[in-house]
Amino acid sequence: MAAQIPQSNEVRVGKKPVMNYVLATLTLLNQGVDRIEIKARGRAISKAVDTVEIVRNRFLPGQVRVAEIRIGSQTVTSADGRQSRISTIDIVLERVK
């Protein structure tokens, strides 16, 4: 699968520390974005949840809410040809009006 370019309202969570993703989310919100999608796969799912909770409870309490949570899985083919499934999560944060 070819890597896709993230959209301007998207934060993709990976191996970096949680605070990097919190800062990216806060930066997007400060730029005026009203809906942000935080996406993660596999082991990074817990980091995505931590990111959302830190933004909601520590930095912007009462100012953002979780609008939607989507879970799923993707089939990935390894270098030796085996297929495996990887869990995914998309959390949509939106500004409270």
Curated annotation (Swiss-Prot):
InterPro entries: Alba-like_dom_sf, DNA/RNA-bd_Alba, DNA/RNA-bd_Alba-like. Belongs to the histone-like Alba family. GO terms for molecular function: double-stranded DNA binding; RNA binding. It comes from the Archaea. It comes from Ignicoccus hospitalis (strain KIN4/I / DSM 18386 / JCM 14125). NCBIfam families: DNA-binding protein Alba (TIGR00285), PRK04015.1 (NF003088). Binds double-stranded DNA tightly but without sequence specificity. Involved in DNA compaction. It is found in: Cytoplasm; Chromosome. The keyword Repressor does not apply. GO terms for biological process: chromosome condensation. GO terms for cellular component: chromosome; cytoplasm. The lineage of its organism: Archaea, Thermoproteota, Thermoprotei, Desulfurococcales, Desulfurococcaceae. Acetylated. Acetylation at Lys-15 decreases DNA-binding affinity. This is DNA/RNA-binding protein Alba.
